[in-house]
Amino acid sequence: MNAVILIPARLDSSRLPRKMLADLEGEPLIVRTWRQALRSNLASRVVVAADSPEIAAVLEPLGAEVVLTSPTASCGTERIAEAARSIEADVFLNLQGDEPLISPENIDLALQPFFDAPAGSALPDCTTLVFPLGPDDRTQIDDPHVVKVVMDGEGNALYFSRSPIPYVRNSSPSLRLYRHVGLYAFTAEVLQRFAAMPVSMLEEAESLEQLRLLESGFRIRCVNTAVDNPGVNTPEDLELVRSLLRRASRA
């Protein structure tokens, strides 16, 4: 099984422009994400799929492999699919470029189901990670930047939403709430099929690319993780990550 990590990196984010180059205690954000990806035990290669030579300019002197992709990709998965066409692999993991604190263990958790599949059996279409939320975690439950997920009895995603799901009319001791941890692993075939499909209705409504797969009948297997690392979507997130890095450097 050959697994490759692809990191989509777009320079002009709408919520935090040029965040890939934002300074995080002496290193650009994208460099820190790339360094964390290199620590995976299961991936054989890490490639950054960038839309700007400026991103390549900070990575390539460090030895990073960078593929320049079209600036017109509608989402990160389309960007990595473009890069993947020139790379031989069985599985591709989409690690968002704005995850500078991503745990290497989380990367390997998403990849492990592909390695565990018995010889000759079907591989998962796609895997991702989920993190449990408590019923009192209202800040995250109500935050549209925090994506929530509900699953079937076998751990396959039923739906992802920026809204609180499920709607809790009657609480139950067995009710479990989860947030989505935004990395995905795909077979090479499913990744290219995703990129060939048009943007779906629910994907456009929620601005969540994974809904394109669900609407087309693919299964997304959700793997539980106990490690939740903050990504960077807003200026407030950026300051939080900076403070965490400063704290870690003093430890």
UniProtKB/Swiss-Prot annotation:
Enzyme class at the top of the EC tree: transferase
Compartment(s) of residence: Cytoplasm
GO MF term list: 3-deoxy-manno-octulosonate cytidylyltransferase activity
EC number: 2.7.7.38
Catalytic reaction list: 3-deoxy-alpha-D-manno-oct-2-ulosonate + CTP = CMP-3-deoxy-beta-D-manno-octulosonate + diphosphate
Pathway: Nucleotide-sugar biosynthesis; CMP-3-deoxy-D-manno-octulosonate biosynthesis; CMP-3-deoxy-D-manno-octulosonate from 3-deoxy-D-manno-octulosonate and CTP: step 1/1; Bacterial outer membrane biogenesis; lipopolysaccharide biosynthesis
Keyword tags: Cytoplasm, Lipopolysaccharide biosynthesis, Nucleotidyltransferase, Transferase
Role: Activates KDO (a required 8-carbon sugar) for incorporation into bacterial lipopolysaccharide in Gram-negative bacteria.
Name of the featured protein: 3-deoxy-manno-octulosonate cytidylyltransferase
Species this chain originates from: Chlorobium luteolum (strain DSM 273 / BCRC 81028 / 2530)
UniProt gene name: kdsB
